[in-house]
A protein has these predicted regions:
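Intracellular coupling helices
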Residues: 262-281
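Membrane-proximal extracellular/periplasmic loop immediately following the first transmembrane helix
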Residues: 3-65, 170-172, 178-184, 188, ...
Length: 281
């Protein structure tokens, strides 16, 4: 239970980090509720809405599985994402090699986990080596610019490869009609949450330039980072979530068991005391 409630609290800024989740309504009817968001949400929110200090975008729904090649070694890999430099500004994932400020700043860069570094490069220094990624839509060559620790098991984010966001085709960078990214914002105060949710639909109107989803009201739910794991499962989640109700039920069950054990102990103690009193009497 303690483990389930510890998710994503390893990041020092977690009380101010929120995931931006997409909502779509027709009139008052909620028709869609997704964990993912548009590629363009983060930058537009930072530019137009007060209270957002920073943001990051993670694109992992576009090409989550790719062929990765290094020299003669060719493997099919998953847990591949595209991330912008804000990733290491918001999250405290440890970088063992490389510079957090620059490792995702240019096209054609990739940060890999320590396990992946051993898998492809054995004892060689991976920094500066080239990995070739071939997905359903794009093929790119990336220079390894960082090696990070494995992401903790009590994180809802788990990737083996982080490719620089600008490695994606330019038209996708701010594209509003592909909700295939995960957006996280850093707020100057948690009190901004309701204000941003209220103002987002008004802001969204000027970005809805295509017919797709134009008949719907675009909105967002801002979910605190530490709450993501135990909130209800939505469409396009990164991973299967935990169950808050089940965790609470376990806590109450544990309390009940302890209470019963305590009552039994008291009853047994009283019974023994009375028995000794009769023996003395």
């Amino acid at each position: 239970v303690t483990f389930e409630f510890s998710f994503d609290k390893m990041h020092t800024k977690y009380p101010h980090i929120y995931r931006v989740q997409s909502t779509f309504r027709e009139g008052e009817v909620l028709t869609d509720n997704w964990a993912s968001s548009s590629f363009g949400y983060g930058s537009a929110m930072k530019e137009n809405l007060a209270g957002i200090e920073d943001y990051t975008r993670i694109g992992s729904l576009l090409q989550p599985e790719q062929i990765v090649k290094y020299g003669e070694l060719t493997l099919r890999e998953n847990q591949i994402a595209y991330a912008d430099p804000g990733f290491f500004r918001l999250f405290d994932f440890e970088l063992l090699k490389g510079d957090k400020k620059t490792s995702l700043s240019m096209p054609g860069q990739v940060v890999i986990t320590e396990r992946i570094a051993r898998k492809y490069f054995k004892e060689e220094d991976p920094i500066g080596k080239i990995l070739i990624f071939t997905g359903p839509y794009y093929k790119i060559s990336c220079e390894v610019t960082g090696v990070m620790e494995e992401m903790p098991s009590n994180s809802h984010i788990h990737y083996n490869f982080l490719i620089s966001y600008t490695s994606l085709p330019k038209f996708i960078h701010e594209y509003w009609y592909k909700h295939e990214a995960y957006t996280y914002v850093l707020l100057d105060s948690p009190e901004r949450e309701a204000e941003i949710e209220r103002e987002f639909p008004v802001m969204a109107e000027k970005y809805k330039t295509e017919e797709a989803l134009k008949n719907k009201t675009w909105g967002v739910d801002l979910v605190p980072l530490a709450d993501i794991h135990l909130t209800p499962q939505l469409g396009y989640e990164m991973e299967t979530k935990g169950n808050r109700s089940a965790m609470i039920a376990l806590v109450f069950a544990a309390i009940a068991i302890l209470a019963i054990a305590w009552i039994n102990y008291i009853n047994l103690t009283v019974a023994r005391s009375m028995e000794r009193a009769r023996e003395v009497g």
